[in-house]
């Protein structure tokens, strides 16, 4: 039996008491009120970190709204792929997680860059302020938006049976044909009563219309524009290199950051010593393999720079500075090779060195020996003498503690950029 999504309903329309609103979000909403602009929360959780809080605002007000929210501690993320949305992010005051405000100057029917419905002004005019001081879209409009959103999220996004009043039924009929709103309301009622067959059939007909795709030339032009972040507002991303011997927890940290950071994350491998068993014979000719590796590293670092330009956080899984850590006295040829590798890629904003005793790293992964791992540990720590942007993190902590510490480092580094 299909029922309305309680989480969706609570997040979109639940008011609750003022203490249920996160203090950083309350400050942001107070800043909007102080501006005197119209705004309305569309969906999102207000009482906890994590997830986006979608807020409707007029496009003409964005120029004033964004600086006002920045003044409360948010930072605008550069996100060309999400335009015309504006994404603002902050680490919450207690350093327990992230908050994201997604400002919507248009109402997209079926997800990002889908067909827009010209009802935003009407929704703002009909919005209601709750006992907690938060302005939300009216309940009737909320149920219609949830039905339309089902083309993107599925029938589980329903919050109630839409009623045939307000601006949205007419907008639905204008886009999907006369009678579509009535059919949608009836199908939603049946779905919430336990039979969603009619709703699923209706959504199959609605989806291609609401997700209207531009022509191939327009799509290709948009991809190029997004990749170059052409005239995209917001702050560019940052790059962190995650370093440490085997068993320090590099992979676990990178995967955890990719899952938890609300900024788009790109992972690039810039290690220099990984062997390739499928390497063709011609690459084993002296000098050829090195040239291929240098070109590969340069290409990966160039893509990483583009990712940063687009506002993404780049995580380097290892880095070419590993060339400094080779033990023993290298030959002249090796010194030349290591020097070329070392200068093949720019340094990241921060080197994160995961530090743990050799015995602990051996116990975790069982590779090499405790003595070898301890020697490599010391070589990584020596990077502090060469670079002033090395941060050593205690990797004897549990994985979640390490991740939270580095999340805070990401925030401090990114929010300090100009």
Predicted feature residues:
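Conserved substrate/cofactor phosphate-moiety recognition/catalytic segment
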Residues: 258-298
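Conserved NTP-donor binding/palm subdomain of two-metal-ion nucleotidyltransferases/polymerases, i.e.
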Residues: 2-238
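Glycine-rich phosphate-binding loop used to anchor ATP phosphates in small-molecule kinases
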Residues: 286-345
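A glycine- and Lys/Arg-enriched "phosphate-lid" helix/loop adjacent to the NTP-binding pocket
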Residues: 321-382, 391, 396
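Hydrophobic positions on the alpha1 helix immediately C-terminal to the Walker A/P-loop
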Residues: 253
